[in-house]
């Protein structure tokens, strides 16, 4: 199954918002248009048996290819995404974005979303151009709440929206907006895993420099490492649960492979 197929089928999408959720199973990417009499050569899988029983003659559903997808993405540009054990988390996020837009075909649109706007209309048919086109001022810090608000205002209902980041700075009052997005769009959140999730490679008296600024001199021992491990796991669990409650499909962004991380959120082998 391809990533596009998974999106058309609403694969692994939560149904926490009931009837307000816009995206239901979209079959094989086709939409029903009308009924007509069956003729030899028609796809027998399209026979409508209820209509056949009512009319007494075989009736088949006429279907047309479903509307094109709009693939939108918000990617965290904050300084904390520029850290990692072997490479920056931002590189894995870029891989996930490439795979996301790589699922587009000729009639689909690709849209980057930022705090200042979205990809210009003229670039939305070109996945590569949409991926590279700036939507924010590089000198301005990443603003997650503003980016989510732009998505709500600018994207059409039913858009497939991907949000990739560590999301450390999402305030609790944003939960309502996340829920609105989850009801309006087919949303997927990839939560960047802390690079030192498995073990904090520090010991003794050390000086720490925060990715977002600030310095501290602390002692790191066995108890401190255990407390750190508990904290990063709890933070990741809480973020995944928070997005899931808001009707977002969720996954974990692993530093080693952004493509595989995106695919895992949909339960498929590779995002293609």
Where are these regions (language model features)?
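Exposed, interaction-prone extracellular/peripheral surfaces
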Residues: 1-24, 37-42, 51, 60-272
């Amino acid at each position: 199954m391809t990533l596009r197929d998974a999106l058309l089928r609403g694969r692994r999408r939560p149904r926490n918002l009931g009837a307000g959720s816009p995206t239901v199973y979209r079959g094989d990417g086709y939409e029903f248009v009308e009924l007509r009499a069956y003729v030899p050569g028609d796809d027998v899988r399209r026979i409508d048996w209820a209509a056949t029983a009512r009319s007494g003659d075989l009736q088949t559903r006429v279907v047309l290819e479903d509307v094109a997808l709009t693939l939108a993405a918000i990617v965290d540009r904050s300084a904390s995404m520029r850290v990692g054990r072997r490479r920056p988390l931002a590189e894995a996020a870029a891989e996930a974005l490439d795979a996301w837009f790589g699922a587009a075909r000729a009639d689909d649109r690709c849209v980057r979303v930022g705090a200042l706007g979205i990809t210009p209309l003229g670039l939305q048919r070109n996945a590569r151009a949409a991926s590279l086109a700036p939507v924010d001022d590089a000198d301005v810090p990443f603003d997650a709440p503003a980016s989510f608000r732009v998505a709500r205002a600018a994207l059409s209902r039913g858009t497939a929206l991907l949000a990739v980041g560590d999301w450390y700075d999402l305030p609790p009052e944003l939960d309502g907006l996340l829920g609105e997005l989850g009801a309006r769009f087919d949303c997927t959140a990839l939560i960047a895993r802390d690079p030192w999730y498995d073990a904090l490679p520090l010991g003794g008296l050390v000086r720490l420099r925060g990715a977002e600024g600030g310095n501290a001199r602390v002692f790191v021992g066995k108890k401190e490492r255990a407390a750190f491990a508990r904290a990063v796991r709890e933070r990741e669990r809480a973020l995944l649960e928070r997005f899931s409650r808001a009707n977002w499909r969720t996954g974990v962004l692993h530093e080693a492979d952004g493509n595989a991380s995106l695919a895992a959120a949909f339960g498929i082998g590779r995002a293609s």
